[in-house]
């Protein structure tokens, strides 16, 4: 749905849960996903098998457990969410052909529901930052936690965490048993700032170049007061919150890779060191996924092979130069980052998904490595840019 830009004010609402008026039955697996427990532990608490259905009293018992943890629905809304899911009509599914070497324009949270099971060997993406950029063609989604906003423009950092985890929940059924998810996400600080159109605009402003704008001249501003615990200027720890909750969804957290950038955006250093890292969360749906560590040594560095300055082993520390961010999208996602993720986790001919395709970097890497791909992006503008970049990469192979 269309989105009217609004300021980001990270207030924490006071919940007033209503526990009466629910009479549905809910699959145990669905309840496990929103209570942060394994299906076997849920069964142990309520005294039922994993194939059983649960009622409202069972859910209330689970919400009273010390083991309860929020995943992507706040505690006060869980019964409402489960009721809505049980009444939800089935959606038409896409075919494998519909998903092969295709760019799909739409919301990832909607498109993922329509995709076939177990088709992707690798899912790799770089998500938006929380409340730091305005993208083209932004559309609002209505999320499981009740918030209506574009992904990345939530009112609180935990809203962004919940929405990230909701997308991971919806993506899980599409991943093959030995497949991998590589989820690149950057952290941010709970600070009063402007939400700009791109990184170049931010850099020009820091250098005093371009049009000078005051605080009130920006279309969207981010405030820092009103949160239940985050103080002004405090790091939000978003990648680690997503990682913890992904484990509660049933993913295996295989590693949290530190992407060290050889150069990064300048930042004020009045009270802290400058950031030069992001994180790549490696998730799987079984204990032992496919892993081709030889790719690190054999592949060219431009596609994800070892850089001259990197260690002689494939570790959880990757030192890669960020992209210059040219073009309409302006992301810092370099070709060798998705290239490495794809190369170590898949084989030629396998299918790769990027649910936030942007300018098409993941598909370009997949194409050059002989993999097939699916891209999703909510922006028709970025989808066209991605298709141009992918077409150029494909033509260069012949």
Predicted regions and their residues:
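A detector of low-complexity, intrinsically disordered, Ser/Thr/Gly/Pro/Ala-rich segments
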Residues: 2, 33-36, 51
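A detector for short, charged/polar N-terminal pre-domain segments
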Residues: 2-23, 89-100
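Short hydrophobic transmembrane-like helices used for membrane targeting/insertion
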Residues: 6-8, 42, 46, 390
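Short helix-start
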Residues: 10, 20-25, 29, 48-86
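Core catalytic lobe of class I
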Residues: 30-32, 36, 40-44, 64, ...
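The DNA-recognition helices of helix-turn-helix-type DNA-binding domains
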Residues: 49-52, 359, 369, 390-393
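Cysteine-dependent PTP/DSP-like catalytic domain, specifically the C-terminal lobe
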Residues: 381-398
């Amino acid at each position: 749905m269309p989105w009217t830009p609004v300021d980001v004010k990270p207030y924490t609402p006071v919940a007033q849960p209503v526990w009466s008026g629910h009479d549905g039955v809910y699959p145990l697996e669905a309840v496990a996903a929103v209570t942060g427990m394994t299906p076997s532990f849920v069964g142990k608490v309520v005294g039922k098998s994993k194939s059983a259905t649960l009622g409202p009293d069972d859910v209330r018992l689970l919400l009273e457990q010390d083991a309860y943890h929020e995943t992507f629905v706040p505690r006060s809304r869980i019964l409402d969410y489960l009721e809505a899911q049980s009444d939800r009509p089935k959606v038409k599914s896409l075919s494998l052909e519909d998903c092969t070497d295709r760019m799909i324009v739409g919301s990832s949270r909607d498109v993922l529901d329509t995709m076939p099971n177990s088709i992707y060997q690798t899912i790799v993406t770089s998500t938006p930052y929380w409340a730091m950029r305005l993208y083209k063609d932004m559309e609002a989604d209505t999320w499981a936690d009740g918030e209506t906003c574009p992904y990345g423009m939530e009112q609180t950092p935990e809203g962004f965490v919940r929405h990230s985890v909701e997308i991971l929940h919806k993506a899980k059924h599409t991943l093959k048993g030995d497949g991998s998810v590589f989820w690149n996400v950057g952290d941010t600080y709970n600070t009063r700032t402007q939400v700009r159109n791109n990184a170049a605009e931010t850099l020009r402003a820091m250098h005093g170049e371009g049009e000078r704008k005051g605080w009130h001249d920006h279309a969207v501003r981010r405030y820092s007061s009103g949160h239940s615990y985050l103080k002004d200027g405090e790091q939000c720890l978003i990648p680690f919150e997503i990682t913890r909750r992904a484990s509660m969804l049933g993913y295996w957290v295989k590693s949290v890779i530190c992407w060290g950038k050889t150069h990064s955006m300048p930042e004020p250093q009045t009270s802290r060191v400058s950031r030069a890292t992001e994180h790549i969360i490696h998730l799987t749906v079984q204990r032992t996924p496919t892993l081709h560590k030889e790719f690190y040594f054999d592949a060219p560095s431009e596609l994800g092979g070892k850089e001259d300055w990197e260690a002689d082993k494939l570790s959880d520390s990757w030192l890669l130069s960020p992209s210059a961010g040219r073009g309409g999208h302006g992301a810092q996602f370099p070709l060798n980052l998705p290239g490495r993720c794809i190369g170590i986790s898949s084989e030629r001919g396998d299918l790769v998904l990027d649910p936030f395709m942007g300018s098409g970097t993941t598909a370009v890497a997949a194409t050059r490595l002989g993999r097939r791909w699916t891209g999703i992006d909510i922006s028709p503008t970025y989808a066209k840019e991605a298709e141009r970049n992918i077409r150029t990469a494909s033509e260069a192979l012949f």
